[in-house]
Amino acid sequence: MSESVRTNTSIWSKGMLSVIVAQFLSAFGDNALLFATLALLKAQFYPDWSQPVLQMVFVGAYILFAPFVGQMADSFAKGRVMMVANGLKLAGAAGICLGVNPFVGYTLVGIGAAAYSPAKYGILGELTTGDKLVKANGLMEASTIAAILLGSVAGGVLADWHVIAALVACALAYAGAVAANLFIPKLVAARPGQSWRLSAMTRSFFSACVVLWRNGETRFSLVGTGLFWGAGVTLRFLLVLWVPVALGITDNATPTYLNAMVAVGIVVGAGAAAKLVTLETVSRCMPAGILIGVVVAIFSLQHALLPAYALLLLIGMLGGFFVVPLNALLQERGKKSVGAGNAIAVQNLGENSAMLLMLGLYSLAVLVGVPAVAIGIGFGVLFALAIAALWIWQRRQASY
């Protein structure tokens, strides 16, 4: 990386474009690798309950390193942190290609992802400012959604052709992300010289957790976003199990196409939320959250591809409308209390803890032999009830 300071704050500067390209390739690799590795587990005759466990080891890395990755991003040049993180992802993907246990390789990818997250968001504010920062965040989210769509589909389609070829493609995507990171200017570390004592770092992180949890609005946001992303990742794995049972389709590509419909819907729903919901009217998003659970239950009863696509598109639209206002609320209130970086780190911990819990319950249901359709119906009903309870709780808190 070349030594430089921020002189060009345009969202089309070389540094900003390098960040966006690196983010696209890294997110593409993440999504393609998930479905390629799931195909590998199927090819090697791992039991069905092992599929969500794969994601659990990834999420576990996020939780384990949550107190430390924020400080790491602030203590070094963020472009360099991103490069090292993508290097860890590359090592994990390459290891799986070379026969390393897929759970071990995927854990390494999870460690890289945990380190990558705060750096990729934090660097935007160092490369641009003001209104351009909003546009830069928009570019980041657009590249991420595009990577989710293309990566998920590519992982499934390539795995149907050749599993190892799919895994190699993932490793190449991570290598491209590392190369893109080389073109990010080396910026001054935001907060160098901080204490690296584990006790001090952990204490600082959990004090931020306490501050956010004691505030009614941020607590409401943390619970809502945690439930949403926990449900979202569980739905991903439910689709892999549900498609052969409900639709009679046994390829690796169809679940990725269905997942892509959810991502498209999220984009539409997020756009609607931006126009219809403000920080003062966040509660408008709650009916959409309840409807997510209702539609998931209806979806689980389908036996044809076309209505399945339509219902997943609707689930994504409801999800985007639900989660975007909650994210904005946490970022705004968190910035004023513990700082934006700490707020994101705490949110990551909450979301990944919810993912771990929901994936654990899903794995248990599969292990004891609950049918995929029954899991989907129960999952949808429980999610709708959980969001309804959260809404009632929030209204009572607001009335005090």
Swiss-Prot record:
Keywords per UniProt: Cell inner membrane, Cell membrane, Lipid transport, Membrane, Transmembrane, Transmembrane helix, Transport
Keyword Transport among UniProt keywords: yes
Membrane spanning residue stretches: 19-39, 53-73, 91-111, 139-159, 164-184, 195-213, 227-247, 257-277, 281-301, 304-324, 352-372, 373-393
Cysteine pairs bridged by disulfides in the record: none
Pfam families: MFS_1 (PF07690)
GO MF annotations, alphabetized: lysophospholipid:sodium symporter activity
Topology of the protein relative to the lipid bilayer: Multi-pass membrane protein
Entry-linked CDD domains: MFS_MefA_like
Keyword Cell inner membrane in record: yes
Highest taxon of source: Bacteria
Matching InterPro entries: LysoPLipid__transptr_LplT, MFS, MFS_trans_sf
Principal cellular location given in the protein's record: membrane
Localisation: Cell inner membrane
Coiled-coil segments: none
GO cellular component: plasma membrane
Stated family: Belongs to the major facilitator superfamily. LplT (TC 2.A.1.42) family.
Family annotation (HAMAP family): MFS_LplT (MF_01585)
Main function: Catalyzes the facilitated diffusion of 2-acyl-glycero-3-phosphoethanolamine (2-acyl-GPE) into the cell.
Full protein name: Lysophospholipid transporter LplT
UniProt gene name: lplT
